[in-house]
């Protein structure tokens, strides 16, 4: 579990105030949720990124708010790709004994046998819905694919996961599959098309015949 300090924002904030906060390297944020009133705060952007890299997108953070330390998760955040800047964060105060359902990323491990034979690994599901208490939410789910041949697939029911959590997706939902390689036209088909093009008469240029007759 990681810690992050915040500074309470006082009064009503105008757009120019929020811009000034961002230009100073801070991110405007709001904290709300279990047993807490809505509080407007700001946090250091660099420190926030460090914390997320440490605990993951669904990790629990000890957020310092005034004289209190509150356990929170990141409910949402906005990012401006043009400025490469986090523009706002929603912190959700949580009850550590209460289960939550969140999206957890799927990480494929290994190289499929079928991929070595020319097949293509297709991953329909990049995230899975997981229900658990905050401390039991995994940062990601690893799926071993080394033994998959062309035509093989793994569904949610096939996953070998450990931990005190429940995957909410349908058991038959496909997580990953190895599909046959896409085949281009054969040499015979290419030759047939080229022969057809050669037999096609060139279009007559309008006015050419009349000029010859003159």
From Swiss-Prot:
Belongs to the bacterial ribosomal protein bL25 family. CTC subfamily. Keywords: Ribonucleoprotein, Ribosomal protein, RNA-binding, rRNA-binding. InterPro entries: Rbsml_bL25/Gln-tRNA_synth_N, Ribosomal_bL25/Gln-tRNA_synth, Ribosomal_bL25_b-dom, Ribosomal_bL25_C, Ribosomal_bL25_long, Ribosomal_L25_dom, Ribosomal_uL5_bac-type. This is Large ribosomal subunit protein bL25. The keyword DNA-binding does not apply. GO terms for molecular function: 5S rRNA binding; structural constituent of ribosome. One of its GO terms (biological process) is translation. Residues 179-214 are annotated as: Disordered. The lineage of its organism: Bacteria, Bacillati, Bacillota, Bacilli, Bacillales. The gene is rplY. This is one of the proteins that binds to the 5S RNA in the ribosome where it forms part of the central protuberance. Pfam families: Ribosomal_L25p, Ribosomal_TL5_C. Residues 188-202 have a biased composition (Acidic residues). SUPFAM superfamilies: Ribosomal protein L25-like. The keyword Ribonucleoprotein applies. One of its GO terms (cellular component) is cytosolic large ribosomal subunit. Part of the 50S ribosomal subunit; part of the 5S rRNA/L5/L18/L25 subcomplex. Contacts the 5S rRNA. Binds to the 5S rRNA independently of L5 and L18.
């Amino acid at each position: 579990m990681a810690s992050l300090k915040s500074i309470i924002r006082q009064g009503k904030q105008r757009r120019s105030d929020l811009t000034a906060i961002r230009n100073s390297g801070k991110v405007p944020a709001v904290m709300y949720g279990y047993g807490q009133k809505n509080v407007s705060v700001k946090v250091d952007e660099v420190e926030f990124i460090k914390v997320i890299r440490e605990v993951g997108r669904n990790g629990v953070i000890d957020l310092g708010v005034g004289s209190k330390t509150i356990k929170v998760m990141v409910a949402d955040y906005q990012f401006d790709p043009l400025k490469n800047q986090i523009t706002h964060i929603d912190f959700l105060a949580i009850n550590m004994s209460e289960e939550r359902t969140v999206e957890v990323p799927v990480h494929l491990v290994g190289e499929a046998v079928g991929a070595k034979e020319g097949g293509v690994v297709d991953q329909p599901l990049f995230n899975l819905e997981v229900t658990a208490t905050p401390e039991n939410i995994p940062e990601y789910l690893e799926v071993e694919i080394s033994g998959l041949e062309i035509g093989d697939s793994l569904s949610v029911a096939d996953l070998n996961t450990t931990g005190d959590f429940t995957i909410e997706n349908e058991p038959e939902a496909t997580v990953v599959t190895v599909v046959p390689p896409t085949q281009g036209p054969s040499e015979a088909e290419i030759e047939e098309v080229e022969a057809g093009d050669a037999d096609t008469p060139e279009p007559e240029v309008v006015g050419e015949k009349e000029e010859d007759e003159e």
